[in-house]
From Swiss-Prot:
Family annotation (SUPFAM superfamilies): Periplasmic binding protein-like II
Organism: Gloeobacter violaceus (strain ATCC 29082 / PCC 7421)
GO terms (BP aspect): L-histidine biosynthetic process
Coiled coil (UniProt feature): none
Subunit: Heteromultimer composed of HisG and HisZ subunits.
Gene Ontology molecular-function annotations: ATP binding; ATP phosphoribosyltransferase activity
Protein name as it appears in the record: ATP phosphoribosyltransferase
Metabolic or biological pathway, per its Swiss-Prot or TrEMBL entry: Amino-acid biosynthesis; L-histidine biosynthesis; L-histidine from 5-phospho-alpha-D-ribose 1-diphosphate: step 1/9
Length: 214
């Protein structure tokens, strides 16, 4: 019986494919510029890869269309889906942060005015963060160029992923506070994981301990 692996499009794809290649599972065709395929079978015929949006990886795993997935912790926190979180794979580091305009009067999250507007692609994470601190805010969901929200006056702050901080700096923004760190996580379909589907635990162990060339 084949095991299906959900691979994330975007920043984590290259690292995901490298880790799978390190244990003999090659979905490198997904990286080719001319590739239009969304499903691939590896040479052994034992594994199938699904190339999906990062936000959809835990959805495919939770519903059992994939038994294994690799996805950022940020997506898991945002989606809150019932998947087995098997391991932190350590690559693809970034952080979820609150940021404001560098010339704003705010020097900490506590300085933000009550009921101020906060823009984010990660409204679940943002809501949880501000509720834990008992800071009432109005969340504005955006799905691209979140940095524009403070620059245009739409919002006083944003909650977004930060990698190097270059994008924030280039757009005149500064981090106020880190909410959490995010790296690539290995996840599995909960029932398959609990019942020990044939070959699943062996595969998960290999992915977890794979020696990936630097």
């Amino acid at each position: 019986m084949n095991i299906t692996i959900a691979l994330p499009k975007g920043a984590l794809l290259k690292g995901t494919i490298a880790r799978l290649q390190a244990i003999g599972i090659d979905f490198g065709e997904f990286l080719e510029g001319s590739n239009r395929l969304l499903r691939l079978e590896d040479r052994s015929g034992r594994y199938e890869g699904l190339l999906v949006r990062a936000q959809d990886v835990p959805v495919y795993v939770a519903y059992g269309q994939a038994q294994v997935g690799i996805v950022g912790f940020d997506v898991l926190k945002e989606k809150q889906l019932p998947v087995a979180q098997v391991a932190d794979l350590g690559f693809g580091y970034c952080r979820m942060s609150v940021a404001v305009k560098s010339d704003s009067p705010y020097r900490s999250v506590q300085d933000l005015p009550a009921h101020c507007r906060v823009a984010s692609k990660f409204t679940t994470c943002a809501r949880s963060y501000f509720e834990e601190r008992e800071l009432p805010v109005e969340l504005i969901p955006l799905y691209g160029s979140v940095e524009l929200a403070p620059l245009t006056g739409m919002a006083e702050a944003i909650v977004d992923l930060v990698s190097t901080g270059r994008t924030l700096k280039d757009n005149g923004l500064v981090e106020l506070e880190k909410i959490f760190d995010s790296t690539a996580r290995l996840i599995a379909h909960p029932l398959s994981y609990r019942l020990g589907r044939v070959g699943l635990h062996e595969l998960l162990g290999q992915i977890r301990t794979a020696a990936v060339p630097a």
